[in-house]
Amino acid sequence: MYHGVYEGAAADAQEKKILILGESHHDLDSSITTQEVVEDYLSPENTTKQSLQFFHKIALAFGVDTGKVEEKARLWDKVFFGNYINKSLDGPSGEGDETAQTLIATNRDRYNQDLVDFIKAHAIETVFCFSDRVFDALPNEEGHGSWTLFQDVKCGKADLWFGRGYGPDSPFCRELKVYGVPHPRYWNRAGIKPEELAQYIRPIFEDCCG
C-alpha cells in the first residue's frame, strides 16, 4: 500500500483490529509517508489545512467531536490507515479520477495482494473503505468465500452504506467484514452528511475498540 500504513499507537493492541482504507494521496508531496500525513492531521495547528479535510470528514463519520484534539487522537490511536492505489494522484481536478480508474484496472491484482498481505499479517477483522471505486475492486466473487453483508443503504440515488463479508475460503483466509462508503469528496454533491454515516460506523467501531 502507498508509502506504508499509518499505525495508531494502540492499533495493534485492539481485540478486533480495524483498517481504514483510502483510495490515494491527493495534493501532497509524494515523498511524505502515510504515517506522516495522519500525524500532520492530528497536529492542532493543521486542522483546517485543505489537503487534510479527507481525514476530518472521516473522523466526523466516526462520530468524533473534531473540535477536541483528544477525541481525534482516541479514534486514530486505535486504527490502521492505508491507501489502496500505489501512487500519489493530483488534486480533485478530474485527472485524478481518470488516473485512479486506469491504475485500478491495470493493477487490481497487485493492489489486492498488497491488501491481503497486510490484513493477514495484522489479523485485521474490520475494514472501513472510504471509496466505492476501491470497494468494487476488492475480491468480490460471490460463492468464493465472500458474500454481501446487507442490502445497500441509499442516500438519494447514491449508495451511502454497503458491505461485504469474507471467510476462510476467501483470499484473506480469515473472517473479515468490509464496510464501504463513497469517497468524502463526493459527499456534498450526493447530499451525504457525516452524521448519517456515524449512525452505522460508530457502533461497529465501539464494538471493535470500545
Where are these regions (language model features)?
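Short, solvent-exposed loop/turn segments at secondary-structure junctions
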Residues: 23-28, 85-89, 132-136, 183-187
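Short, contiguous, well-structured surface segments enriched in hydrophobic/aromatic residues
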Residues: 70-89, 93
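A Trp-anchored, charged/polar loop motif used as the substrate-binding/catalytic surface
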Residues: 1-10, 56-68, 105-117, 156-159
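Active-site and ligand/interface coordination hotspots across diverse enzymes
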Residues: 1-54, 114-117, 162-171, 203-210
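A short acidic (Asp/Glu
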Residues: 30-32, 91-93, 131, 137-142, ...
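Surface-exposed cleft-lining segments at the edges of enzyme active sites
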Residues: 35-53, 85-109
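Proline-aspartate-enriched helix->loop->beta-strand connector
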Residues: 113-132
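C-terminal capping/extension of enzyme domains
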Residues: 99-112, 116, 139-210
